[in-house]
Amino acid sequence: MSDRPGVRFESTIPIKMRDGITLYSDLFMPKGNGKYPVLLERTPYNRTAPFSRGLSLDSITAALSGYVVMIQDCRGRFESEGEFHPFVNEINDGHDTIEWIANQDWCDGNVGMFGGSYVGATQWLAAMSQPPALKAITPGITASNYHEGWTYQGGAFELDFNLSWSLIHLVSANYENLVNNFGAPPDKIEELTDMADRLMDEYSHLSLKDWPALKGIGDFYYRWLEHPEYDDYWKSIAIEEHHQNIDVAALSIGGWFDIFMGGTIKNYVGM
């Protein structure tokens, strides 16, 4: 993507995390040499996709209005290195990314975050670590607890949501990462695509922990099955357990018929 009048675009910017893993980001920023507030989106859904650049916030309009917009692939997603374990790495990775931003000569020291669903989760999780430069978040349609209300419901594994989300959004769409980082052969990619087209057949596979499709490429799915109870694995990443540690302005956005409405209300009340 080329520069637009008044907007400078920089692609595939490497940002190293505390453990040496590199995450990649794109920047939309005003042309000039000033210092600007920064709006950050951290996504598992491909930072270069049109909806990442324009659904929650129009990146070009924001840059023309005097903001820097950074969109980053989460760990293990698309071009970013590492292995993707939903939620687990977003606390430190969010903190490290915000610290990196705050140290750039184009940042005025103020960072905000935006986006919904999993992208909303990355905001709450980053805020839990209290990076000094983070001043505000706008999490939309996301949960307060990733055990009850996301992965489990009343003690039952949310098979429909978990399987479809993992297979369609997190694995099949991540072709380049599967090939480069996991060495997945073409027939494996074809197998996953076929499964995504016939999900109803996959729902009937028993036992759940023996479902072979995600072995070695989406091990988080099996880790969720290993933690059916609300144990320390879940508590460490549960927003509602850490509201007292979140000291930034938060605009919570929900929908009355959204699956995460309960979590949206809990986060609002908890703050």
Residue ranges of predicted features:
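Short beta-strand/loop motif that positions the catalytic acidic residue
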Residues: 246, 252-254
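N-terminal cap/lid segment of alpha/beta-hydrolase-fold proteins
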Residues: 1-32
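A catalytic-pocket lid/entrance helix-loop region that shapes and gates access to the active site
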Residues: 114, 121-190, 256-257
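Proline/glycine-enriched tight loop/beta-turn segments at coil->beta junctions
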Residues: 21-23, 30-39, 107, 245-246
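Active-site-adjacent alpha-helix of alpha/beta-hydrolase-fold enzymes
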Residues: 262-271
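Mobile cap/lid helix-loop segments that gate and shape the active-site cleft of serine hydrolases
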Residues: 49-51, 204-241, 248
